[in-house]
């Protein structure tokens, strides 16, 4: 009599496949990295303040000092935007993330360009500086609007980049109060606003690193 062989029943005691870590967990920033980034931003800001405050002779070439200050400040801004981008401050939407990527690229690219400035022809450098300065400030302002609008970060670090980028309000206020002849006062207000705002932002990264890391 013929017999029919049936396949053995499937095993139910097989160990489960290990779960693959989520991509978001792999991208999460640790509080230590955020604190280190904040400390690096502070160091670069100190370089910016030092070389901006150094007295330069009227008949000397002050470009080197201005260049070092510009590189240091652009790099400090790039660190903040890089942490915000990696830490999820721009959210998951493509539009604001594209803004963050573009701002970081503009800031990092400007820092690299200004770093090689002394070896470039002077005419080319002067023309490029007319583009890089508004590009850096404009890119940072747009990124700061994104951080504030998306709202993934909480606490001072959410609003401080936007306050830093709002330097025209301070400069215009100084001019309105003191008159159009206060060019030097307006310049000091501009530099002071940028330095103070960026310093507070870097301190916020250090002090609030744990909460910022939880949003990444």
Task: Name each region found by the language model.
Residues 2-9, 13-216:
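Hydrophobic, aromatic-enriched alpha-helical segments typical of multi-pass transmembrane helices
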